């Protein structure tokens, strides 16, 4: 199983108060991996990334998506070495690309 698929399985198991829809889209590049729906009726997108180093690899299309849709979009990054999870706001995509996993996150772990 690919690392991002494993991360999705962790999310689905750990965060049950959100309805998750996995987006399998090969026709519109840059579309995030997940669409979340909260009990309050709010939608948001979540891009899943897994890294072995500080660098977080995002395609130009993924960066463009978060630049165009900075609100209610997030990027969840798992560091394989430490197992640490960090959640970043989509509006911080340029900072995430520049600073990598060392960038301060808006949230840590799946319990937050």
Q: Where are the predicted features?
A:
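Intrinsically disordered, low-complexity terminal regions enriched in charged/polar residues
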Residues: 85-112
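Acidic-basic catalytic patches of nuclease active cores, encompassing PD-(D/E)XK
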Residues: 1-25, 39
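Nucleic-acid nuclease catalytic cores
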Residues: 67-92
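Structural signal for conserved beta-strand scaffold positions within catalytic alpha/beta enzyme cores
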Residues: 22, 47, 75-77
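Mg2+/Mn2+-dependent nuclease catalytic core
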Residues: 51-70
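Conserved catalytic cores of phosphodiester-cleaving nucleases, focusing on short active-site segments
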Residues: 34-36, 42-52
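Short strand-connecting beta-turns/loops that link adjacent beta-strands
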Residues: 39-41, 80-81
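Beta-rich catalytic cores
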Residues: 30
